[in-house]
Structures are given as C-alpha cells and as structure tokens.
Amino acid sequence: MSSTVSAPAQIQLSQRFRGVRSRTLAICKPLTPEDMMVQSCPEASPAKWHLAHTAWFFESFILRDFLPGYRLFNEDFPWLFNSYYRSFTEFPEKRLRASFSRPGLDDILRYRSYVDEGIERLLEVNPDPEALRRIELGANHEEQHQELLLTDILHAFYTNPLRPIYRPFDSNQDMRSASAEPLRFIHFNGGLIDVGFSDSGFCYDNELPRHRVWLEPYALADRLITNREYAEFIADGGYRKSELWLSAGWDVIEQNGWRAPLYWNAEGESWTLYTLRGETSLEEAADAPVSHITYFEADAFARWAGKRLPTEFEWEAAAETQPVSGNLLDAEFLTPAPTSAASNSGDQLRQLWGDCWEWTSSAYLGYPGFAPLEGSLGEYNGKFMSGQMVLRGGSCVTPQPHIRSSYRNFFQPETRWQFSGIRLADKVTPLTGGASK
C-alpha cells in the first residue's frame, strides 16, 4: 500500500459516494420495472442497464484491484455490463441492451448494494490514493449516467403514445414567464489565455494539459436562444434553405425529414413541446431556451442570424471566473427554464451553467500533450476524439458538482437527444463600444 490518506478525506469521499449512488436510485423512483427495460433509440440505454453499468464500473476498476479478497457478485456481469472498454473484456452490442430481461431489477439492485458495501469496506481500511482517485472518477462517471438516465427516460416516454409524465410540475412551478429581453452581446478582448483544468480537484484527462491559446476579440450573446427565436427561424423557412446548412447537415435533415427540434410537434399553426414535466405549448415555453437540436441545426440558425457559434476556448475564457450556479439538476426544474428566470446581471453572461449544453464550433480533439489514463481507463475519453463536436456549460439535468469551466462534453454533430442548445458569438473590433472583459 502506498502513502496513507487522511481520515477526513475518506469520510468526505464516503459521503460523496453515498450521495451519488442515492441520487441515481432517486432518479429511477418514478419508473415502473417495465419503464426500466425500454431502449427507444440507438443512442439510449435502458434505465436498468444504467443501474448495473455504474455498479460494474466501481467493481471492475476499483474493487477488483484494491479490495483484498473481493469476489465478483456474478461471473457473467463483467461481460454483460461493460459499455465500450475493449481492452477489459468483450461486451454485447449496445443495440441489444434492452433484449436481456435477465438479470431482473431485483438482482440489479442487490448487485448495487453488494458493490456499495465493498466500496465502504475499502474506504474503512485507508486505501491506496489511487483507489480514492478511482472512486472519485466512478462518482463522476455515475453523475454522467444520471444525466443520460434522464435524457433516455425523456426519449422513451416521448415514443410512448400515452406520453407519460416523468414528474409533473409542482404547484409553484410552470413554464410561463415575462418575455425575454432582447439579445445583447458582451465583448471580450481575447489575447493569449490559458485554458484547461487548473484546480487541485478532480478533472477528466481530456481537460488536460492546461495550455495557452490565442483569441481574437469576440462577443458572446448574453443568454441562450429561445424557443420563440428558433420558431422564427422555422417560420422563415430555415429548414428549406440549403444555403444555411453545412452539406452533411443538409443531408441529415433531408434523410430524417426534420423540420423542427426533437420533441416539437406541429399543432395546426403552432407547436407543442414534450418535456420531462409533460407536454406544453410553444406559447407557454416561448422564452425557455431551445433544446434538443443538433450541431448542424445550431450552426444553421447562427448563419441565419448573421452570427456564428463560439469556439470552446472563447466559451471557457468567458466562463472561467463565473461561479457555477444555474438551472442544473440540483434545481430540480428538469427542463430548460424561461430566460427571464435567469437574473439580469448587467454586463455578465447569463445561463452559462445549466439549461442546455451549448454547441461550440470546436471539434473534439486532444489538447497539445494530451495523455490518456493508463490501462483500460485510457479508453474513457481519448478514443472518441474523432467526428465529434464539443459542448460546454451543462444542462438542466447535469449535477452541479459535476460541471466546471474546463469541462468538455462531446457528441456527434447529428446528435440531438441530449439537452443541447445555442449561444451565439460574433467577431468584434478591438476597443469598440459595449462591455469588454
């Protein structure tokens, strides 16, 4: 065993571990066992699988390596609940996850309890610091799956003709709000800046190493684009004007017949929007941020508006000094909130955190000197650095402890089952009018 770890650090990590594991179960509480078997699109996974896979991660990368005498809960589970770690073991195709009715939900819950007990025993014996680092990684991994759970539940319920409601609004909650204020642009001077993780806590390998980049002066919209503004793009024929679209994006919308964001349904001359809180009208949600759009749709809207999407480094430079606070999972609103609910903070950007992941124009690539984790954990991020775009800022279903200014989410540009939206950017001339940072 290497150098010891302080008791307070172990206690703090134990509390964090229990909190994360409890929240995952709380997310599943409104579901029936039948709900937890559904896999409604190729990108999604059944809720039952998420419960098992997150336990598998702790068992496979922590308990097997660091808890003396640990015995697997089930010899078949390492294969059955592996996601994509090819150097670890073989695994079933993702599309087959809903095909396995066994093990049943009760067995999965027993598996989780068994793993929980193992982690707690490990924390009691003052583990190797590497074990603590992996437990923190496992907690962050599970927080990612909490978000995926909710986006997968939303899609599963949307495909059900009965349109179930995951969680109705409380009596003091709704989507109605005053009209959003006109879009304003906040100017930033750019220059030579440092980007990447700089703190002493946890981060993913794709946030490192910290390095310098050059930014020309730029401006960012003070808030996200609303449903009302996106509806204007639709009404103006945005989905019929090929000149607004990247070639691959035009192919995607034509092949799929897309003429609006996911979860929008035409009702005569208006629209309804389906959410985790149930169905609502466009009129009611007009000033909430538009969500569930692809990178291609975000890019086409920006071109239609005469603007562009920000780079990931423009976003990070603007967000680095801003405290993490907003419509995140901890707020339990579970859908992008009306823009007027975000406080008007003068020359500060609003809605940086939560509501919707913000598409950037940056391809997902390794930073100069990027080094993946050793062993099978090196497959966590690095092997996906091809054909994906970076998103920043978190969403309404991102746990608040999970997000930070250097956090890099990434998805294929045709992906839209996540809470993904738009913040516009623009170029500026140095020393022009308006706020500068």
Task: Map each language-model feature to its residues.
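Functional-site microenvironments in short loops/helix caps that host divalent-cation chemistry
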Residues: G138, E142-Q144, L148, D152, ...
